[in-house]
Amino acid sequence: MVYMREDLPAVARDAASAITRWLEAMPETVSVRDVADDPQYRARHIDLLWTRRTTDGTCTEESIRVRGERYGHTGEYHIEAVSGADETSPESMVATEADYLYYYFLPRAELHILPMQQMRGWLREHGAEMRQLRPPTVLDSADGVEVGRLVSRDRLLREVGGIRVVQIRPRAA
């Protein structure tokens, strides 16, 4: 899939907005902070910080990378890789340093929550099996050329523990 450059901000904005509303509606939420434009977090590919109260009453903060997707029919996730890095090194498999990747399919209002600790381990083991995107399917973004791997959703759901799929109710018009 290839997005036109002008479509990218709208997709990302719509996904982040829907996810933020969903998180804010949860009773355990203390705050949701959009840090996508903060250079400190942008460099680490982190978009949101979610502070929530745990069952024991303490607060915890989770970092989230948001990925918006209009085309849910491919059966694959696009996992961002580190641009310009050695493709075979484990460090190059995933660009984000976030705790979670929230992969949101806009037309279906379906959110896939991928725990990045488990994902990193799985990608270290299996990343070389995944197809890496090459031009012309790489995206020229504000952060440089976006490269990545196409990873089967079905395979990840089978092989990586902790992935959740949530239906987000769209906001009433």
Give the location of each predicted region.
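Non-catalytic C-terminal interaction segments of nucleic acid-processing enzymes
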Residues: 3-7, 21, 55-58, 106-173
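Short, conserved, surface-exposed binding loops centered on an aromatic residue
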Residues: 40, 49-55, 91-95, 103
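Short connector loops at helix/strand junctions that flank enzyme active sites
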Residues: 43-45, 57-61, 74, 95-98
